Design a protein with these regions (language model features):
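Surface-exposed acidic, glycine-flexible loop patches that form ligand/cofactor-binding
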Residues: 19, 328-332
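Conserved acid/base catalytic micro-environments in cytosolic active-site loops
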Residues: 1-308, 313-316
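Phosphate/ATP-binding catalytic cores across multiple sugar-kinase/actin-like superfamilies
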Residues: 129-132, 317-329
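Conserved class I S-adenosyl-L-methionine
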Residues: 332-340
Length: 340
């Protein structure tokens, strides 16, 4: 995993605040480099054409040569495969590929395109896209890291998991070049490590769970696929949520009942997706009967934040209200101020 000092530099496309996505289907972000085209061919050969998902492929392409990757992939799938060179709305059952010398980002339900910065010292195109995917599509994003050299994709994949999405890495012994998958796995944030031929079925299972899952309403959790309308089911869900937090406190010693509700729901929803469970009562039963699940849920609850100053309102209040007072205090002229 990257150290904090190696945080991903802001790209031109990231200077604007990412708007949440309005899309009601999963967006699958796929990062690949050396050996990645062969892995992509196997993935799309095994992916049904009418799967209801969208795929965005970010590869390390030479900025000095045209790429025919989209034409090669089109030979193994009936989904529409497009190489992106201009802003493009994302549609289901489509595959979008990065163009040479370009950077892809996601904003709302669109792909944005900017010219790649030639001064950028290392490949981070996958990280940058996956971070915007996470911020835009949140718990309905999936990040996949395939064959490649280096570590691009590891930080972006971690961000997807932080925002409630699901993460997958190609099994290293199945990858032609295993550095990128191994780097992703080393973050501890990968949900599934699979041979590339098994990834399509996993995606189908995840999408099936997403569109049937039911959770209590919360204004800050994007749930376009399902909602609980029945009052009795809503009460049962709220009771199950309380029981889940009680179980977690009993087994881990950590009490999350005062945590932000949206964060708690997002973390539990992620575990429900991973375990293919459709509602909170089902997850409560799974948690009761699966002792090791408490450890996984706790890890999700305590997942590290991958952005500095992530809570914008809190830091703006700190800048506006607190810091000026510290330096305006009479004793501040002779008293050191420590920042860490």
């Amino acid at each position: 995993a990257r150290a904090m000092s190696e945080e991903i530099p802001a790209a031109e496309g990231l200077k604007l605040k990412v708007q949440p996505s309005h899309l009601n289907f999963p967006v699958i972000g796929i990062g690949a480099s050396a050996g990645g085209l062969a892995a992509l061919l196997r993935l799309f050969e095994n992916m049904p054409n009418d799967n209801g998902m969208a795929f965005v492929v970010v590869m390390h392409l030479s900025p000095h040569h045209e790429s025919s990757a989209h034409e090669i992939l089109q030979k193994v799938t009936k989904m529409k495969v497009r190489q992106i060179s201009e802003p493009t709305p994302i549609e289901r059952n489509c595959v979008y590929l990065i163009s040479p010398a370009m950077q892809l980002t996601m904003n709302d339900g669109y792909l944005r395109v900017t010219e790649l910065n030639p001064a950028q010292p290392r490949h981070i195109a996958i990280d940058i896209f996956m971070r915007t995917l996470a911020d835009a599509h949140a718990e309905h994003a999936v990040a996949i890291v395939l064959s490649g050299s280096g570590s691009d994709g590891s930080a972006g994949l971690s961000r997807v998991k932080e925002q409630g999405g699901v993460t997958i890495a190609q099994a290293p012994d199945d990858a032609e070049y295993d550095e990128m998958p191994r780097s992703a796995i080393a973050t501890g944030q990968v949900d599934f490590i699979l041979p590339v031929g098994d990834i399509p079925q996993k995606l189908i299972d995840l999408w099936q769970t997403m569109r049937t899952m039911q959770l209590p309403a919360d204004a800050e959790v994007a749930t376009p696929f399902r909602s609980i309308d029945d009052p009795e089911q809503s009460r049962a869900a709220e009771t199950a949520l309380k029981d889940i937090l009680t179980l977690l406190r009993t087994r881990s010693g950590h009490d999350f009942k005062h945590y932000k509700r949206a964060t708690v729901l997002r973390r539990i929803e992620r575990r429900m997706q991973v375990n293919r469970l459709g509602d909170l009562p089902a997850y409560r039963a799974f948690l009761q009967n699966t002792p090791e699940e408490a450890r996984h849920l706790l890890a999700d609850m305590l997942i590290g934040v991958t952005n500095f100053f992530r809570d914008r309102e809190a830091f703006e209040a700190l800048e506006r209200e607190i810091i000026p007072r510290v330096f305006d205090m009479p004793e501040s002229a002779d008293t050191p101020v420590r920042v860490w």
